[in-house]
Amino acid sequence: MKVIAILFLLAFVLCTMEITMVEAGFGCPLFQFACDSHCRGMGRKGGYCGGNFKLTCICVVK
């Protein structure tokens, strides 16, 4: 029963946290605020630097 509850919780979290990849750059990895500003300018909730060596700007969907 605990396994089912954990799997359900994991599925719920993954469904509520949609992210989309954006082109590399946009301030990453040194200026994460530039990535966040870029994503907000596209109407997203925000953004952060991720991927290998934090070189990719990842935007969080609303």
Curated annotation (Swiss-Prot):
Signal peptide: 1-24
Subcellular locations according to the entry: Secreted
Secreted found in the keyword field: yes
A single MF term (Gene Ontology): potassium channel regulator activity
Disulfide bridge positions per record: 28-49, 35-57, 39-59
A GO cellular component annotation in the UniProt record: extracellular region
PROSITE patterns documented for this protein: INVERT_DEFENSINS
Organism domain of life: Eukaryota
Xref: Pfam families: Defensin_2
Keywords noted in UniProt: Antibiotic, Antimicrobial, Calcium-activated potassium channel impairing toxin, Defensin, Disulfide bond, Immunity, Innate immunity, Ion channel impairing toxin, Potassium channel impairing toxin, Secreted, Signal, Toxin, Voltage-gated potassium channel impairing toxin
GO BP annotations listed: defense response to bacterium; innate immune response
Tissue specificity: Highly expressed in non-venom gland (hemolymph) and moderately expressed in venom gland.
Record's function text: Antibacterial peptide active against Gram-positive bacteria, but not on Gram-negative bacteria. Also has weak blocking activity on Kv1.1/KCNA1, Kv1.2/KCNA2, Kv1.3/KCNA3, KCa3.1/KCNN4/IK, KCa2.3/KCNN3/SK3 and Kv11.1/KCNH2/ERG1 channels (tested at 1 uM). It inhibits potassium channel current by interacting with the pore region.
Family label: Belongs to the invertebrate defensin family. Type 2 subfamily.
The protein, known as: Defensin BmKDfsin6
Origin species: Olivierus martensii (Manchurian scorpion)
